[in-house]
């Protein structure tokens, strides 16, 4: 049904979905076979790098999101996530039963992770900016071209954030 086929457009691919099985491919199989767009959390905890590569090769406009919680950038410890208490430890955020509950992923780390699993930096950047903007119908965002919003970042050779520009103006993100 079209309702079932739209699920992978509104859900992090692989997460809270039955695993891919050769006799019952489920939503993951439908996305891999038919989707133009789907989203994935590239924190290397939610999805194994091998499964990420399968999705990246199968879904032309697979885009990546952080799914970050308030624990991102904070030390390990307990944090609130809605009505839940979650624990940040070893880069992950988990409920008391061990279930992943969001992430601590930042966009710059997402870029480094995508490059680490073999994507060229240009494709990794596109999957973090242009493809999500396109999915949302925001063609004036997610790309550097005349008429687009000039929101961008500059990184050094190690892909560490050095500058942030919002509407074409450099901002002091280190003291924000």
Show which residues each predicted segment covers.
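Short, small-residue-biased leader/transition segments that mark boundaries at the very start
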Residues: 1-8
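Catalytic core of soluble alpha/beta enzymes
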Residues: 5, 15-30
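Short beta-strands and strand-loop turn motifs
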Residues: 9-13, 39
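Short, acidic/turn-prone active-site loops that include or flank metal/cofactor-
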Residues: 13-19, 44, 68-70
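Short acidic/glycine-rich loop or secondary-structure boundary segments that cap or lie
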Residues: 19-20, 47-50, 71-76
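His/Asp/Glu-enriched, well-ordered alpha-helical/loop segment
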Residues: 26-40, 56-148, 152-155
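Short, Lys/Arg- and Gly-enriched loop/turn segments at beta-strand edges
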Residues: 159-164
């Amino acid at each position: 049904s079209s309702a079932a086929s739209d699920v992978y457009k509104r859900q992090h691919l692989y997460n809270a979905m039955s695993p891919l099985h050769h006799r019952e491919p489920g939503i993951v199989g439908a996305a891999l076979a038919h989707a133009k767009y789907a989203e994935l959390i590239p924190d290397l905890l939610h999805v194994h790098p091998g499964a990420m590569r399968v999705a990246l090769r199968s879904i032309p406009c697979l885009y990546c999101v952080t799914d970050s919680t308030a624990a991102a950038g904070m030390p390990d410890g307990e944090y609130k996530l809605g009505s839940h208490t979650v624990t940040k430890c070893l880069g992950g955020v988990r409920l008391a039963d061990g279930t992943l509950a969001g992430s601590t992923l930042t966009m710059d780390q997402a870029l480094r992770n995508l490059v680490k699993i073999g994507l060229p930096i240009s494709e990794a950047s596109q999957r973090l900016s242009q493809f999500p903007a396109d999915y949302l119908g925001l063609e004036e965002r997610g790309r550097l071209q005349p008429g687009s919003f000039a929101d961008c970042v500059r990184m050094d050779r190690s892909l560490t954030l050095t500058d942030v520009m919002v509407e074409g103006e450099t901002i002091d993100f280190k003291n924000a």
